[in-house]
Amino acid sequence: MPRPVTLFTGQWADLPLAQLAPLAKSMGYDGLELACWGDHFNVQEALSSPQYVKDKHALLAQHGLQCFAIGNHLVGQAVCDLIDERHQSILPPHVWGDGEPEGVRQRAASELANTAHAAAKFGVKTVSYTHLTLPTILLV
């Protein structure tokens, strides 16, 4: 296969993945970079539930799509940003916690490491975040 053409799903997070997948295929995409928001990819579920991983793979396969990367850009934003109340709306509650900036940064960094582990369980070798892309081998 020549270089695959992929769609990052973050801009489409208001659509359930079950609706977005057939749309992406109809637009000619070979695969997706799943965002870790909306219902596209849940890091904690992927870490704790083999069935979750199987179901996501089945959904993509049903539409002839592959997953080439997992994108956790919103959490990645919190690693180096100056944290303030605006971050609460883009972060999962377990990352935001009490909103204390250093705690948010530490939890965000931990969540990115967990994203790499979840991606590995999903069979994906690339995690992207805040304009950076690293092979999961560097993070796992």
Task: Enumerate the language-model features and the residues they cover.
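N-terminal pre-domain/capping segments
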Residues: 1-124
